[in-house]
Swiss-Prot record:
InterPro entries assigned to the protein according to its UniProt record, in alphabetical order: DNA/RNA_pol_sf (IPR043502), Integrase_cat-core (IPR001584), PolX-like_BBD (IPR054722), Retrotran_Ty1/copia-like (IPR039537), RNaseH-like_sf (IPR012337), RNaseH_sf (IPR036397), RVT_2 (IPR013103)
Binding site for Mg(2+) 3: 1644, 1686, 1720
Protein name listed in UniProt: Transposon Ty4-H Gag-Pol polyprotein
Function: Capsid protein (CA) is the structural component of the virus-like particle (VLP), forming the shell that encapsulates the retrotransposons dimeric RNA genome.
Keywords associated with the record: Aspartyl protease, ATP-binding, Coiled coil, Cytoplasm, DNA integration, DNA recombination, DNA-binding, DNA-directed DNA polymerase, Endonuclease, Hydrolase, Magnesium, Metal-binding, Multifunctional enzyme, Nuclease, Nucleotide-binding, Nucleotidyltransferase, Nucleus, Protease, RNA-binding, RNA-directed DNA polymerase, Transferase, Transposable element, Transposition, Viral release from host cell, Virion maturation, Zinc, Zinc-finger
Species assigned in the record: Saccharomyces cerevisiae (strain ATCC 204508 / S288c)
Length: 1802
């Protein structure tokens, strides 16, 4: 507030201003009354308005100064107040003087009767005007002598007009109205200047300034007019149109053009015509860019050698240097002018650069960085002889048409071009690809053409000197002929044209010419010498797999046919013949006519379409401009994840095709794909889409697509109603792609589910084959840029391949069998299907075999190929017989059991009728057969796959179905399809898997035909055989067929190698059968009468026995319940059956014995007291017709001496099955989501896998010590601790009552579950925890993991982070504010839900209640709470911003609050306002005060950190004492073994996990990695919070998280030991009252210091005198030098500094905080200060350019510090103890940022 003294002073100042104004007015009145005989000139009233505007502006400035003066009066510092008041008083006096002058002028204008102030005076010299300037008075202006002679009526000349007007003002000593500081001048002077500048304006420019009498407004209007028409693109094109070479001798024209461009940039870049450093550099670069390459170096050399003339500016000096260089280097002499140029008859330059050329600029249309573009110029008929005029009587607008005259055999001699071009690469010697995108304009075409490469053409001139034979020639495939420059030909070979252009030659050779349509032609074989076969031609290096070589190789027609996806033979031959592919190929044709049965069947047609219907329309459009599109589908499929529709777009000109597959064809999906396709064409091919043809389907005629086409300017052409033939090209291409895809699926025996990959493969192949209509590859024809295609880069679809398994285990195969699909559009690799993993992956590391046979036969042989015989088989004849049976079964299966794939599987009836009517597709018939399907269900497509996981143990059981019995023939086929090798059948007749490779076996399992697989595992009743050795003793047969003929369903157990060989003593036990049966109360299961062992099996519940009824005998069986009695949940058989029906591939029956506890089982099994021996006679085993089994099987069973164990599937799912999983913990599952045995076994095996979660080097892991949470059963139902149980009960009732009080739900309003959809019901759980302070807590939460998408929309929200808390504390401390901390109880429950959600009723599980509030666990609860709190705080005047969400403050900045979920910290300028705000919060929320100021000290914790705030001293300390104390207790025993140290890091880090091998078991490795993850999680939490001193040590050891070496554990415990010893270290903040706070960052880097040659960077960041952030990270890029690493560090430090600066600005902490960057790298500083630097690696160059730009803008200041003084050095490498203590002083703020700045060159 202003003091009374200041108010009295202010009144005195106001009185002085009024007195001065009155005195000035009286004086002016006296002057105006003086008589004058001068003729008066009228001035307009607008001048008065101008002065009034200026007066108002100065009054506003004066009011601002007064307000600032009042603020200064509140400052306590008297000395500072006096100094600032003195400066402010001077400023106020200046403003008051300007106000008095303006009032005087306004009164002068208003009191003048005739409003005339400009008077004419006459003296001896002539008529003149008097006016005053800002520097002098009574200046005379003579209109006749002072002439402004520049006139213009063109907007383009406005810069020249203003520049000349500026010179006029300077010459006649007017006030410089272009200066920013001058805002008003003498009215008489203003009138004079307005009249002068208006005389220079034409009619079109004077219209906008007719009524304007203010010179400033006229100048601003001209500038704005010019700027509005000269945007950045216009200016860039203006510079690109200029090319200066040595032939531009017209210095006046050249200077005028360059000066015009320079003035254009000056008036655009700056408001006045003054030079600035940025504009100076830009203009120099732009002028140098207009120079030809041959001229640029000469100009640069002159600039360095010639001293700069001080009298002229830099741009004029540069332009003069360019003109002088052009004149000196010009090759044209005065006596050399001949009749060549159509304008000046010169032979040394093209007409485009001639000074007499009308309406052309100096340069050529091309980007600055490209080579000069040479225009081909046609001669004017007036400059030719009569003979030439007769020969050139043709239409000038007609294009060249050389096709009629066989352009491949003729060469054009061009007299107006300076370059040689050819479209035939074979003519070029030493061909090289062009690395620069050079383009020529005007070479036979209206549009520009691109240059792909260059070489040399040899001319037959008869000379022996080979140098004179070679002409540099550019390879332009778009041109239609070879064009030779007449000038180049004469210069190199001295061959010239005769006078009448009838011959070309020299003294030795003469060639006859032929003139066609005014163009000179010669025969190619008479002029050009073709390269021989041994000539070296530099081919383009391929970018695909390095396994392919470019040397000439042979390829069979069959191989090419398969690689190119069974496309047409003629297309393949033409594509190879015309050299469309990059490699050199020699096609070996078949001796007989090539015949592909697959193609004939899959591509059969009814009749061909009519040809040439769209060809005329296509030729009228350029490539990529006209498209036709259509949709194909739906594709019938039983899988829901199969895409059903295909969108196709075909270019009418080039026939380039684009396809995409979709699940539906709604408007949104189709429009999104059309957008994507059009953007792809415009970006990748540089083409403009102008029209699209389609039918009238609703997917193409909706409003969304029409609006998009209108916005893009695309003409949408629709066919007539139901006229599909009008869109014939798209229809035919659909047929082509679909038949190609059908062929590929049939050839590869893949299911329809893979049709989208077949479509992609077919599309890619069709785009890379020559089209018969265009004779070009569609991909090459549509692209403006050069495209290389290699035929050998295509892989045959559906064929087998081997991809590299990058995660293979030791001593395991590194290859993974797979099936080739198609190219991956998002990578350089191919997509492969891995049957063993049931996944689709992308890889570029693959191997494919040599294809010499039909793929269908090859696949069949690979699937059913038998292995060699095992050496330990007893009877070789039996083996041979078995193999014979298997082969016969395979033959029968191939002939009789193939599933048929018909067109009905791919098309609907509507589409089939459409196909018949239009004859676009083959009619549905039985000629499209498909081979057997693989069992590829639930295919996962992923870019990353887990190929390291072990193959799970699979037990394939062959069972019978109750309603379906297999025949002997089918059974043999099924057995053959399982690929059981004879070598894998041991002498006892059972399969032995101990020597089977896992990868091979896994492949076999997945390659079983689906029809057989369903029969193998689809039955309800299964006979389970657990003891392989015992049952093999009982089953001995000569061949498998004899056993199979009995119709008996066998079960073959294939056990994992690791489990089978775990304990060999298990197989050496006595011949006693371990009989396991499970009891199910009141349940009976009847086996089928046919093909079963027993007719009735009844289970009854006894203590330790189960009675098995087979026939008339009841046998007691001892179960494993007596060994270990466990219980499990009840699983319903019906649910399991439902699960199997829903899955396409039912899970096989798993082995029910838990081998993990095999030792205990063995010991119990060998105990004769616990087990009884069972004997089964022939009466116990019924046969197919209900009688006994066959004599052969009966004999085998009797010989075994052991009974047959019978297991029913329902018994397997019995309630009492827990004894099988004695080592397994019981899992909780959802009530409605019971797991099958297959899932349980799968989860069990997955839990055994070695899964390592890596911690990245720069990962900010934030974790706290876990508090164990338990559920209701453990806390209350089964809790033996009565006291704890009582506490948990009370906590539960308290939570339930709180939910009722908060009106989260209403228990009185309940709904039946049947009334509410299942997707709206969310299950709940009750979580019980015991806090560290001993409080028991219960919380009812929702199961968000089961939440349906229908119950939530947007769930993302932004919250407060730890850096924002630190900013909050620093600002509050600097403002000397009062602080308190508090918690909001039940925070989420205050937020209302918008969605309709129901939860189970707390008292009646049959009902549900509606949820009204955001209960914990819901996905949207955090967002709803944040939105609710933000809305409330905004309503009471507290706002946050996007940079610091969760940090709110008022506009006066006197109240702040930081909220993280329910934890809050509040700061206010006074204690009263703080208490008022907390009371306001209490009225809306239930609060708990956790920390308050006591004696000006706040000692509390916030977000896990210990906070001590001393308001009186102005200090803040953040530590982690509490957390470190808990770590000390936790790891006390380990820390006793560690020697104490004063530094946390090691002296050296020499561990390399890539080289050092760990000697430990897999279990030890897994446990070690888990332990490392736990330790590093805690250390990362400590480091991230506030312990910056362990940053480097933790980040170094975090890279070894997957390497559990004892040395690594020692490093971690050493860090913990250091933390325990120095637990008081943290972050210290001091109150910083300096208003000019800087953001300071010091950086350092060490190159290649990591074990993998990566670099490490370190950054320390300050705000003012307080440290803000410290981090040590591994560089994201691999640096090759220390300078490059330092540049990365500087950029990272700048990025964080800029973020901090913007955040502070949003919080109102200074609008212009300077950024200071400190580094010890002198080369990095020098490189950043240079104007030009050699480009480095891409990302390094981008970061460097950003820093350079900021340095030029003076946004940052870069300083140099010595290496010893760089405190960030300890963040990149180990340092000594003394240097580390120096960093501790920085954390304690004993060494501040100002001390660091004092060590630099600041």
């Amino acid at each position: 507030m202003a003091t009374p003294v200041r108010d009295e002073t202010r009144n005195v100042i106001d009185d002085n201003i009024s007195a001065r104004i009155q005195s000035k007015v009286k004086t002016n009145d006296t002057v105006r009354q003086t008589p004058s005989s001068l003729r008066k000139v009228s001035i307009k009233d607008e001048q008065v308005k101008q002065y009034q505007r200026n007066l108002n502006r100065f009054k506003t400035i004066l009011n601002g100064l007064k307000a600032e003066e009042e603020k200064l009066s509140e400052t306590d510092d008297i000395q500072m107040l006096a100094e600032k008041l003195l400066k402010l008083g001077e400023t106020i006096d200046k403003v008051e003087n300007r106000i008095v002058d303006l009032v005087e002028k306004i009164q002068l204008l208003e009191t003048n009767e005739n409003n005339n102030i400009l008077h004419e005076h006459i003296d001896a010299t002539g008529t003149y005007y008097l006016f005053d300037t800002l520097t002098s008075t009574n200046k005379r202006f003579y209109p006749k002598d002072c002439v402004f002679d520049y006139r213009t009526n063109n907007v383009e000349n406005i810069p020249i007009l203003l520049n000349n007007f500026k010179k006029f003002i300077k010459k006649y000593q007017f006030d410089d109205v272009f200066e920013n500081d001058i805002i008003e001048i003498d009215p008489r002077e203003n009138e004079i200047l307005c009249k002068i500048i208006k005389e220079g304006l034409g009619e079109s420019l004077d219209i906008m300034n007719t009524n304007t009498t203010d010179i400033f407004r006229i100048i601003d209007g001209l500038k704005n007019k010019y700027r509005s028409l000269h945007g950045r693109d216009v200016r860039i094109r203006a510079w690109e149109k200029v090319l200066v070479d040595t032939t531009c001798r017209n210095s006046a024209l050249l200077m005028n053009k360059l000066q015009k461009l320079v003035l254009m940039e000056k008036w655009i870049f700056s408001k006045c015509c003054q030079d600035c450093p940025n504009l100076k550099d830009y203009l120099q670069e732009a002028i140098m860019g207009t120079l030809h390459e041959s001229l640029r170096n000469s100009v640069k050399q002159r600039l360095y050698n010639i001293p700069h003339n001080v009298g002229i500016n830099h741009e004029e000096f540069l332009i003069n240097t360019v003109i002088e260089t052009v004149i000196d280097l010009s090759p044209i002499a005065d006596d050399q002018i001949e009749n060549s140029c159509m304008y000046c008859k010169s032979v040394f330059h093209c007409s485009i650069n001639c000074k007499k050329k009308p309406n052309r600029e100096l340069g050529l249309t091309r980007p600055i960085s490209q080579k000069p573009i040479i225009y081909k110029v046609h001669r004017d008929n007036n400059n030719l002889s009569p003979v030439q005029n007769e020969q050139k009587s043709w239409n000038k607008t007609q294009k060249k048409s050389n096709k009629v005259y066989n352009s491949k055999k003729l060469v054009i001699i061009d007299t107006g071009s300076g370059v040689n071009i050819t479209n035939d690469k074979t003519l070029l010697h030493n061909y090289e690809d062009s690395n620069r995108s050079t383009r020529f304009f005007g070479i036979g075409k209206n549009s520009s053409v691109s240059v792909k490469g260059y070489g040399y053409i040899k001319i037959k001139n008869g000379h022996n000197n080979t140098d004179n034979k070679c002409l540099l020639t550019y390879y332009v495939p778009e041109e239609e002929s070879t064009i030779i420059s007449c000038y180049d030909l004469a210069k190199k070979t001295k061959m010239v044209l005769s006078r009448k252009y009838t011959r070309l030659g020299n003294k030795i050779i003469k060639i006859k010419t032929k003139i066609v349509n005014g163009v000179i032609h010669v025969k190619m074989n008479e002029l050009i010498e073709r390269p021989s076969d041994d000539s070296k031609i530099n081919a383009i290096k391929p970018t695909s797999s390095p396994g392919f070589k470019l040397n000439k190789r042979s390829i069979t027609l069959e191989d090419a046919h398969k690689r190119m996806g069974h496309t047409g033979i003629q297309q393949i031959e033409n594509s190879i013949k015309h050299n469309h592919y990059e490699e050199s190929l020699d096609l070996i044709k078949e001796p007989n006519e090539f015949w592909c049965q697959t193609c004939k069947i899959s591509k059969a047609t009814k009749r061909n379409h009519y040809t040439g219907s769209m060809n005329n329309h296509s030729t009228d459009h350029e490539p990529g401009s006209s498209w036709c599109m259509d949709i194909f589908g739906p594709v019938s499929s039983s899988n829901a994840d199969t895409k059903r529709y295909m969108l196709i777009m075909v270019d009418n000109n080039t026939r380039y095709c684009m396809t995409s597959t979709h699940f539906n064809k709604n408007a949104e999906t189709i429009l999104a794909q059309i957008r994507k396709n059009i953007q792809y064409v415009e970006t990748q091919f540089d083409r403009k889409v102008r029209e699209i043809n389609s039918d009238r389907g609703t997917e193409f005629t909706n409003d969304q697509i029409e609006e998009y086409f209108i916005s893009k300017g695309i003409h949408h052409i629709l066919t007539s109603t139901q006229d599909h033939a009008a869109n014939g090209r798209a229809e035919r291409y659909i047929r082509t792609i679909v038949t190609d895809a059908t062929t590929l699926l049939r050839q590869s025996n893949l299911r329809v589910k893979f049709w989208e990959y077949a479509v992609t493969s077919a599309t890619n192949i069709r785009n890379c084959l020559e089209h018969k209509s265009t004779g070009k590859l569609p991909l090459k024809a549509i692209s403006r840029q050069p495209v290389t295609v290699r035929l050998m880069s295509f892989l045959p679809f559906g064929e087998k391949g081997i991809i590299w398994n990058h995660n293979h285990k030791k001593l395991k195969p590194s290859g993974l069998p797979s099936i080739i699909l198609c190219k991956d559009p998002n990578s350089y690799g191919y997509k492969f299907f891995i049957p063993s993993k049931n996944k689709i992956v992308t890889s570029d590391n693959y191997t494919i075999p040599n294809y010499t046979m039909d793929g269908r036969v090859r696949n069949t042989q690979n699937i059913y190929k038998s292995h060699q015989f095992s050496s330990h088989n007893d009877n070789e004849e039996d083996q041979i017989e078995t193999v014979t049976n298997l082969c016969e079964a395979l033959e029968n299966y191939e002939d009789d059991n193939k599933p048929i794939t018909r067109l009905e599987d791919l098309f609907t009836e509507e589409e089939l009728s459409q196909i018949d009517s239009n004859a676009k597709y083959p009619s549905p018939s039985n000629n499209l057969e498909g081979d057997l399907d693989y069992v590829f269900s639930d295919v996962e497509e992923s870019g990353d796959y887990d190929v390291e996981s072990e193959l799970s143990t699979t037990n394939t059981s062959i069972s019978t179905d109750k309603n379906k019995i297999l025949s002997n023939k089918d059974f043999n086929s099924e057995l053959a399809s399982t690929e059981i090798s004879i070598s894998e059948i041991d002498k006892k007749g059972l399969i032995n898997t101990s020597h089977i490779d896992e990868d091979k076996y896994d492949e076999k399992v997945h390659r079983i035909p689906s029809i057989i697989q369903e029969k193998l595992v689809g039955s309800k009743n299964t006979i389970k055989i657990n003891d392989e050795n015992r049952i093999s003793d009982r089953i001995r047969s000569k061949n498998i067929g004899s056993i199979l003929n009995t119709g008996l369903s066998r079960c073959v157990d294939i056990t994992d190698e690791s489990i089978t060989n775990k304990d060999e003593s298990m197989h050496n036990a006595k011949p006693e059968l371990i009989q396991e049966q499970f009891n199910k109360t009141n349940h009976e299961t009847s086996f089928p009468k046919e093909g079963s062992i027993g007719t009735n099996v009844k289970f009854r519940n006894t203590d330790n026995e189960i009675s098995l009824k087979t026939g008339d005998t009841s046998l007691p069986i001892k179960t494993l319940e007596s060994i270990n009695n466990h219980h499990s949940n009840d699983y319903s058989t019906n649910k399991v059956e439902k699960f199997e029906k829903e899955n396409h591939h039912p899970p096989p029956i798993e082995d029910i014995v838990d081998m993990s506890d095999q030792t205990d089982m063995e010991s119990n099994c060998q105990d004769g007291n616990n087990l009884k021996e069972l004997k089964v006679t022939d009466k116990n085993v019924p046969t197919d017709n209900g009688t006994n089994v066959s004599p052969r099987l009966e004999q085998n069973i009797e010989a075994s001496g052991s009974p047959v164990q019978t297991v029913n599937k329902s018994a397997f799912l019995n309630k009492e099955f827990s004894s099988l999983n004695m080592k397994r913990k019981r899992k909780r599952h959802d009530k409605n989501n019971s797991l099958t045995s297959y899932e349980l076994e799968r989860d069990k095996k997955r839990s055994k896998r070695n899964r390592v979660k890596l911690i990245p080097d720069n990962m900010e892991t934030v974790s706290a010590q876990k508090i164990r949470a338990i559920y209701y059963n453990e806390a209350i139902s089964k809790n033996p601790d009565l006291k704890e149980k009582h506490e948990y009960k009370q906590a539960y009732h308290k939570e339930l009552q709180n939910l009722k009080d908060m009106k989260v739900f209403d228990v009185d309003v309940k709904y039946s579950r049947s009334e509410i959809p299942d997707n709206l019901i969310v299950p709940t759980n009750t979580i019980f925890t015991k806090k560290r302070n001993g409080i028991y807590k219960a919380r009812i939460v929702c199961r968000g993991d089961t939440q349906s998408p229908d119950t939530y929309s947007v769930i993302t929200t932004e919250s407060l982070n730890h850096n924002h808390i630190k900013i909050f504390l620093m600002i509050a401390n600097n403002r000397n504010m009062f602080m308190k901390t508090l918690d909001i109880n039940h925070a989420f429950l205050y937020a209302k839900l918008e969605e309709e959600i129901y939860i189970p009723h707390p008292h009646d599980r049959r009902c549900v209640v509606k949820l009204n509030k955001a209960l914990y666990g819901l996905k949207q609860s955090p967002k709803e709470w944040n939105d609710h709190l933000r809305q409330y705080l905004n309503g009471i005047g507290l706002k946050d911003n996007s940079y610091t969400p969760g940090l709110y403050q008022t506009e006066d900045k006197n109240l702040m609050i930081a909220v993280y979920v329910d934890d809050c910290v509040i700061a206010a300028s006074n204690e009263q306002r703080l208490d008022e705000f907390i009371n306001k919060l209490k009225s809306n929320f239930e609060l708990k005060i956790t920390g308050t100021l006591i004696d000006d000290v706040l000692d509390t914790d916030i977000l896990g950190m210990d906070l001590v705030y001393n308001k009186r001293l102005g200090t803040i300390d953040l530590t982690l004492k509490s957390f470190i104390n808990r770590m000390d207790k936790k790891y006390n025993e380990e820390l006793k073994k560690i020697r104490k140290s004063s530094i946390p890091h090691m002296s050296t880090y020499k561990i390399d996990p890539k080289k050092d091998v760990l000697q430990m078991s897999e279990e030890e490795f897994r446990q070690g990695v888990l332990k490392l993850q736990q330790l590093l999680g805690e250390l990362n939490y400590v480091r991230h919070k506030c312990r910056y001193d362990i940053n480097f040590a933790v980040k170094k050891v975090a890279r070894l998280v997957n390497y559990p070496h004892e040395r690594v554990f020692y490093m971690i415990y050493k860090i913990i030991q250091y933390l325990v010893r120095y637990k008081d270290i943290g972050i210290h903040y001091d109150r910083d009252c300096n208003k000019d706070k800087k953001v300071i960052a010091i950086t350092d880097a060490s190159v290649g210091s990591e074990y993998d040659a990566q670099s490490r960077i370190g950054v320390i960041l300050w705000y003012g005198m307080n440290i803000f952030n410290v981090y040590s990270n591994k560089s994201t890029n691999r640096c090759v030098s220390s300078t490059e690493a330092e540049l990365h560090a500087i950029y990272e430090g700048y990025a964080d500094s800029e973020t901090l600066k913007v955040t502070l600005k949003e919080l109102g902490e200074g609008d212009n905080n300077d950024i200071v960057m400190i580094t010890d790298s002198k080369p990095a500083i020098q490189g950043l200060n240079r104007s030009y630097q050699q480009p480095k690696e891409k990302f390094t160059w981008i970061k460097t350019e950003i820093i350079k730009e900021k340095i030029k803008e003076k946004s940052i200041k870069l300083l140099k510090i010595t290496g010893k003084g760089n405190i960030a050095d300890l963040l990149t490498k180990p340092v000594s103890a003394s240097d580390f203590k120096r960093f501790i002083q920085v954390l304690k703020n004993k060494i501040t940022s100002q001390d660091i700045l004092a060590s630099t060159d600041y």
